[in-house]
Amino acid sequence: MTVETVIVLAAGEGTRMKSAKAKVLHSVAGRSLLGHVLHAVDHLKAKNVRIVVGSGRELVEEHISLIAPKASTVFQEHRGGTGHAAQLALAGLSPKGTVLVLAGDTPMLTGESLAAFIDAHNAGKFAASVLTAEHPDPTGYGRIIRDDADELLKIVEEKDATDDQRFIF
């Protein structure tokens, strides 16, 4: 398992949570959402860990300095989506090696599951891999659109999804 860079997306406003606190700072089982993700990331021993911050920047950066002092932060002033955030985080880094992009609000990730994912990605010599999950109630989440061979075609945000796509779990 080798991964050069991990990018953690932590700029979201957490609108669905209806809280003034940055989404990634909310606690689950005694640790912030972001803390759970960074705990899993520690297992990978990545050369670079970059965390994209936005909403609640000051408090999020303060929290990061306490729980992941070796990580660096990148400010996403205008929310331009996942691709834009990854592009900001990659600026100035070598284009070599595996890059893992994670959402900062996924507390169920483990170091073992990330390592297995990276191993599968590297073994398959894929240009890109997407780790997905099925959710019993996908309301508010994007949908993974696949072809007949179960290959990923695209990711569609719920607001942009057709009625048929909204039935995808």
Name each region found by the language model.
Residues 58, 109-169:
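Conserved core of the sugar-phosphate nucleotidyltransferase
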Residues 28, 74, 155:
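Hydrophobic residues at beta-strand termini and immediately following loops
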Residues 25, 73, 128-130:
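Conserved beta-strand scaffold positions in the cores of enzyme catalytic domains, especially
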Residues 24, 70-72, 151:
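Conserved beta-strand segments of alpha/beta enzyme cores
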Residues 10, 53, 103, 132-133:
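Short beta-strand/turn micro-motifs composed of small residues
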Residues 1-5, 31-119, 123, 146:
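Conserved N-terminal catalytic core of the sugar/cofactor nucleotidyltransferase
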